[in-house]
């Protein structure tokens, strides 16, 4: 799928978690694979040293009631900062809980994200507003129209 989408697969990094993820498997997972690559016709950039490891040790979020696969913001900020500069555009076609959006906000990147599940769209917007401290200037797009967040939600900010 990576190749069919026009991407070059450079490698697979491993997110090593501080605790097991309990499931039905005989062996319990304590890691998650993260594919790393770039558009085949695109330019590959690297903005850090050559001592970076494929093993990434970041603690799981302490709570993830908002989304079943919530990622810690530092986990996403790490590869974003390694492979982009400030004001670069980052595209996240699976918005989830908004961790990529928040990582981009914290590292001065521009993030375009999409999420199909409406309840997770609400999670993304609320987490983002908590991060920036206000809903001022926050817009959402629904059915092709753009709305100020205050117009579509009951927010005290």
Q: PLM ranges: what are they?
A:
Residues 1-121:
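Core catalytic lobe of class I
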Residues 125-157:
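S-adenosyl-L-methionine
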């Amino acid at each position: 799928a990576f190749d069919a989408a026009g991407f070059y697969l450079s490698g697979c990094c491993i997110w090593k978690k501080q605790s097991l993820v309990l499931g039905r498997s005989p062996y319990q997972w304590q890691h998650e694979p993260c594919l790393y690559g770039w558009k085949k016709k695109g330019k590959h950039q690297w903005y850090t040293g050559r001592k970076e490891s494929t093993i990434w040790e970041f603690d799981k979020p302490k709570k993830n009631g908002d989304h079943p696969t919530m990622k810690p913001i530092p986990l996403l900020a790490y590869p974003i900062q390694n492979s982009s500069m400030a004001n670069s555009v980052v595209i996240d076609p699976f918005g989830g809980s908004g961790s990529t959006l928040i990582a981009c906000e914290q590292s001065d990147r521009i993030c375009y994200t999409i999420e199909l599940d409406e309840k997770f769209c609400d999670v993304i917007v609320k987490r983002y507003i908590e991060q920036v401290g206000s809903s001022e200037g926050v817009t959402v797009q629904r059915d092709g129209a753009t709305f100020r967040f205050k117009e579509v939600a009951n927010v005290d900010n």
